[in-house]
């Protein structure tokens, strides 16, 4: 039987190769040219059995996938240039599109079978692209660009975009991003000159939003066609998206192509400064257009970057890392059950995890750096997508500090505390003292050293905990063994911490551990849950439609993210989506307009340990009740929300820019542009559906300005806190927004410095008063009069036919919190 199967596969391989050479002529097919749309490419007639044979040949593998050609070539470059890693980085950044195709000098080092397997994905995609040109389909996109479009490197660009973004972007968004990126490459290589900027290029050629979407979808079709079905198009909840065809997981892993921007750097990133592009080596090139500020390009936000922030970025970029070799080896051998566990429980991240492992193998023997960017609020983000301290749990676990240290007494203590934190089975350590967490590790040393499968999988973060256990094994053998693992402590709902300090609210400060005289940790989330459940239950008595809510009992795991994001002004819709992502789903089919539609009900826990079934509309009602009652016991939070939103509305009424200064001197301007909806008809599997696309214009989107002001202010305060901290710190510091990482030996000092900088943020900077003063200065600059009537300030707005007077918001009343007390009583501010 095995012999017959081998012959069948060889025959299939032969047929497929000849099938490519004769441009698919033995398939009786045609492309539907009527009502053409980029997403309507579909094969009307083809031999399904032949495709099935091809699919079986390409996916029947009995061994683990090999390292992709792309990563193999990067490994070769790193090895050949290990004494000049700047040169290695330069080659990777400038030649990355060539690394996926064997050249004369590297082909001898690559097994021909690997090359053949890679061609099964990229080769099929490129042949399909050439087919679309020969059949005239590219003429429907652009006659002027059709010859430029058929370029194999654009297949690699599209492929790298798909791998990085398929799971978190809608299909129309992917279409646009790929089409836009390819158009930009065509412009740079063939059209760039002194007479036309890229901004003018689309207008000159009459390329609208639909053009970019259609061009991108042509390339996506090369990976979703029945002849190359690596991804599957799905349509759920009125949204088109992609999912990976599970039969092709091994082929995908052996065909990786990753943009250098998503990879670590092997030399220190270039220095950023005013007017000087830093980061990637390619930024020395005049054609490069990388910016330190990323995200929100559709809008007109502004940030004036300070000298201090540039220095902080350069300091973070200079930190050196290496792969955790012990963990990588463990996950590939006796610890492979963790990856299998993720494959079963987190299917949507499995491919990304496998890519992360392959990148770790590639950089195993090479030190690396993690390039960072900022957004317009000053928030810091690592650029490396698959391997970085702001990435997935696996990504973080595989990173070690390049310079290790023997643990001192404080380092050992906080290393144990961190071990308990990442185990945290069932959230049991949320209220425990540091000493209790330390004691838990001492009591479980035998289990930790044994690394039993069941024990590891009970951890909240299995890969991080496995890395901890492996280091503990080394420490048992040799207490002087240097430790390279970074450890992290997390702030208690940092948004509320900022509001508590801003308002000097003593009670609120206690709940979020700014002030805590005891050894038990206050759990802000648990404090709010009883009142939320009470409001939900009482709604059943007030409204008959809420009768199902009478026994609902939501727990901490369901409400933690809701409460945390409410401090960032999350909407009822946002709460609904968070609940739906956490609750157990029950699929059902309903009939609408004669069509079957898949929808979900949700199982919501009750007081008696059972569940009540709610449909989507009932979950929305539940979210609305939560939103209305979540902060009722803290009226000062409502007062600051009211103040900031009213201030924003006046800015909008007067049509002047919404701007503020952060305590560290950053000048920020918030400005959302209006988006317009464009509908395109998409033909998918013979059925017409409508995709909603958005384009942005320069008009202000007033509806977004008001709800965005609170999260943007809080994010900017988080961002202001970090530069103060990093600027005063001489060792490793790894920021994950409101989470702080360093070597275990430095964690005690880092926690102290976090408190000191937080105190400095609010003791010397009366932030709310400065916002109010800045607002009044802006009114003066725009020659807008403030009038006082009976002790109340009004702004004079010219109306028709008379002047209108709009009352100015009054600053919230301050409380009795002494921020200096945080120094000695804020031990659990980060825990």
From Swiss-Prot:
Q: Which Gene3D superfamilies match?
A: 1.10.287.280, 5' to 3' exonuclease, C-terminal subdomain (1.10.150.20)
Q: Which SUPFAM superfamilies match?
A: DNA/RNA polymerases (SSF56672)
Q: Which residues form a coiled coil?
A: none
Reaction(s) catalysed (UniProt annotation):
RNA(n) + a ribonucleoside 5'-triphosphate = RNA(n+1) + diphosphate
What keywords would UniProt list here? DNA-directed RNA polymerase, Mitochondrion, Nucleotidyltransferase, Plasmid, Transcription, Transferase
Q: Name one Pfam family in it.
A: RNA_pol
What is an example of a GO molecular function annotated in this UniProt entry? Answer: mitochondrial promoter sequence-specific DNA binding
GO biological process assignments: mitochondrial transcription
Q: Does the keyword Phosphoprotein apply?
A: no
- PROSITE patterns membership: RNA_POL_PHAGE_1, RNA_POL_PHAGE_2
Entry annotation: catalytic residues? 490, 560, 738
The superkingdom listed in its UniProt entry is: Eukaryota
Q: Which InterPro entries match?
A: DNA-dir_Rpol_C_phage-type (IPR046950), DNA-dir_Rpol_phage-type (IPR002092), DNA/RNA_pol_sf (IPR043502)
Q: What is its main location?
A: mitochondrion
Record's keyword annotation contains NADP: no
Which of the seven top EC classes does this enzyme belong to? transferase
EC annotation? 2.7.7.6
Homology family? Belongs to the phage and mitochondrial RNA polymerase family.
Function field: DNA-dependent RNA polymerase catalyzes the transcription of DNA into RNA using the four ribonucleoside triphosphates as substrates.
Q: What is this protein called?
A: Probable DNA-directed RNA polymerase
Recorded source organism is: Gelasinospora sp. (strain G114)
**Native organism taxonomy:** Eukaryota, Fungi, Dikarya, Ascomycota, Pezizomycotina
């Amino acid at each position: 039987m095995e012999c017959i199967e081998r012959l069948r596969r060889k025959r299939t391989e032969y047929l497929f190769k000849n099938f490519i050479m004769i441009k698919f002529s033995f398939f009786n097919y045609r492309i539907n040219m009527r009502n053409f749309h980029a997403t309507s490419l579909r094969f009307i007639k083809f031999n399904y059995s032949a495709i099935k044979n091809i699919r079986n040949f390409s996916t029947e593998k009995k061994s683990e996938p090999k390292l992709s050609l792309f990563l193999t070539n990067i490994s070769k470059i790193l090895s050949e240039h290990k004494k000049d890693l700047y040169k290695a980085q330069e080659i990777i950044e400038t030649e990355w599109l060539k690394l996926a195709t064997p050249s004369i000098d590297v082909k001898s080092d690559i097994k021909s079978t690997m090359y053949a397997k890679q061609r099964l994905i990229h080769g099929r995609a490129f042949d399909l692209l050439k087919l679309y040109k020969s059949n005239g389909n590219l003429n429907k996109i652009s006659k002027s660009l059709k010859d430029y479009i058929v370029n194999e490197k654009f297949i690699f660009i599209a492929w790298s975009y798909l791998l990085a973004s398929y799971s978190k972007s809608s299909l129309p968004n992917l279409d646009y991003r790929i089409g836009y990126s390819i158009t930009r490459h065509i412009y740079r290589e063939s059209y760039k000159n002194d007479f036309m900027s890229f901004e003018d290029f689309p207008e000159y050629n009459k390329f609208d939003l639909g053009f970019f979407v259609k061009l991108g979808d042509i390339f996506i079709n090369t990976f979703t066609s029945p002849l190359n079905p690596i991804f599957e198009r799905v349509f759920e909840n009125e949204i088109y998206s992609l999912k990976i065809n599970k039969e092709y997981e091994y082929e995908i892993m052996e065909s990786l192509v990753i943009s250098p921007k998503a990879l670590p750097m092997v030399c220190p990133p270039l220095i950023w400064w005013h007017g000087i592009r830093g980061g990637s080596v390619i930024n020395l090139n005049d054609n490069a257009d990388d910016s330190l500020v990323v995200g929100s390009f559709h809008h007109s936000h502004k940030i004036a970057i300070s000298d201090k922030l540039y220095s902080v970025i350069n300091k973070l970029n200079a930190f050196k890392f290496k792969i955790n070799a012990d963990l990588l080896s463990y996950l590939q051998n006796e610890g492979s059950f963790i990856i299998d566990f993720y494959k079963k429980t987190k299917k949507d991240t499995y491919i990304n995890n496998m890519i992360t492992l392959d990148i770790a193998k590639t950089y195993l023997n090479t030190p690396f750096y993690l390039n960072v960017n900022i957004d317009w609020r000053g928030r810091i983000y690592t650029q490396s997508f698959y391997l970085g301290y702001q990435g997935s749990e696996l990504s973080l676990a595989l990173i070690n500090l390049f310079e290790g240290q023997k643990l001192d007494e404080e380092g050992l203590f906080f290393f144990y505390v961190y071990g308990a934190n990442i185990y945290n089975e069932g959230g049991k350590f949320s209220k425990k003292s540091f000493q209790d967490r330390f004691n838990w590790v001492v009591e479980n040393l035998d289990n930790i050293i044994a690394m039993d499968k069941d024990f590891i999988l009970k951890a909240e973060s299995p890969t991080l905990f496995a890395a901890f256990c492996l280091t503990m094994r080394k420490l048992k053998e040799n207490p002087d063994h240097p430790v390279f693992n970074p450890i992290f402590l997390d702030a208690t709902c940092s948004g509320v911490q900022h509001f508590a300090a801003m308002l000097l609210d003593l009670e609120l400060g206690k709940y979020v551990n700014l002030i805590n005289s005891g050894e038990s940790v206050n759990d802000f989330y648990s404090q709010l849950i009883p009142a939320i459940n009470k409001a939900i239950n009482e709604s059943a008595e007030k409204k008959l439609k809420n009768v199902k809510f009478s026994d609902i009992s939501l727990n901490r795991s369901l409400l933690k993210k809701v409460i945390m994001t409410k401090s960032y002004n999350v909407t009822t819709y946002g709460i609904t989506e968070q609940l739906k992502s956490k609750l157990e789903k029950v699929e059902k089919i309903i009939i609408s307009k004669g069509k079957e539609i898949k929808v979900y009900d949700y199982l919501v826990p009750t007081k008696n340990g059972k569940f009540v079934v709610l449909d989507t509309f009932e979950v929305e009602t539940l979210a609305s009740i939560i939103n209305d009652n979540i902060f009722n016991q803290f009226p000062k939070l409502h007062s600051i929300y009211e103040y900031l939103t009213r201030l924003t509305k006046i800015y909008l009424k007067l049509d002047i820019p919404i701007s503020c200064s952060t305590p560290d001197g950053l000048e920020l301007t918030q400005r959302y542009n209006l988006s317009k909806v464009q509908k395109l008809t998409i033909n998918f599997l013979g059925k017409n559906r409508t995709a909603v696309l958005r384009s942005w214009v320069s008009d202000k989107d007033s509806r977004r300005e008001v709800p965005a002001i609170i999260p943007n202010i809080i994010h900017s305060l988080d961002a202001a806190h970090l530069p103060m901290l990093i600027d005063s710190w001489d060792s490793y510091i790894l920021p994950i927004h409101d989470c702080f990482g360093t070597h275990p030996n430095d964690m005690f000092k880092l926690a102290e410095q976090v408190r000191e900088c937080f105190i400095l943020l609010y003791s010397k900077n009366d932030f709310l008063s400065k916002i109010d003063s800045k607002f009044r200065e802006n009114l003066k600059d725009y020659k807008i009069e403030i009038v006082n009537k009976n002790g109340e300030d009004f702004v004079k707005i010219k109306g028709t036919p008379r002047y209108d007077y709009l009352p100015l918001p009054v600053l919230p009343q301050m409380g009795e919190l002494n921020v200096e007390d945080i120094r000695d009583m804020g031990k659990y501010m980060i825990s």
